[in-house]
Amino acid sequence: MSGEEEENAAELKIGDEFLKAKCLMNCEVSLILEHKFEQLQQISEDPMNQVSQVFEKSLQYVKRFSRYKNPDAVRQVREILSRHQLTEFELCVLGNLCPETVEEAVAMVPSLKTKGRAHDDEAIEKMLNDLSLVKRFE
C-alpha cells in the first residue's frame, strides 16, 4: 500500500500484508487454543504452570466472543462464508459479529456493496439465513 493512500477497512484498503493473510474467526482460534491447552494438560502435572498469562487471557477472550462452539458448526460457518467470494477479512468480520440483517451486514462490512461484486441484498440475505441455521442447530 502506498504511503499516500490511507488504509480504510470499509473499502478493503487494509494493506497488502492483510489482504494476503489467512484470517481466523474467534471460534477457530478458540478451538486451536483449547486443543493446545488439552495437550498441555496431558503432558504436565500442573497445566497452569505451562500456560502463560497471555495464553490464558487469549483463550478466555476467544471463548467469550466465539459465536460458535461446536467444531462442526465452525467448519460449516467457514464453508458457507467461503462460498460467497468474500475476502478473509470480510469472512472473519461476518463470522465473528454474526449480523442478522442485510443492513447490519453492510454496516459492519461496507465493502460487500462495492461496485462489481456479486453481493446483492438477496445473496447477503441467503448467506445470513444459512449462518442462522448453523447457529440454531448447533
Swiss-Prot record:
GO terms for cellular component: RNA polymerase II, core complex. One of its GO terms (molecular function) is DNA-directed RNA polymerase activity. One of its GO terms (biological process) is DNA-templated transcription initiation. It comes from the Eukaryota. The modification N-acetylserine is found at residue 2. It holds the Pfam family RNA_pol_Rpb4. DNA-dependent RNA polymerase catalyzes the transcription of DNA into RNA using the four ribonucleoside triphosphates as substrates. Second largest component of RNA polymerase II which synthesizes mRNA precursors and many functional non-coding RNAs. Proposed to contribute to the polymerase catalytic activity and forms the polymerase active center together with the largest subunit. Pol II is the central component of the basal RNA polymerase II transcription machinery. It is composed of mobile elements that move relative to each other. Component of the RNA polymerase II complex consisting of at least 12 subunits. Interacts with NRPB7. This is DNA-directed RNA polymerase II subunit 4. It comes from Arabidopsis thaliana (Mouse-ear cress).
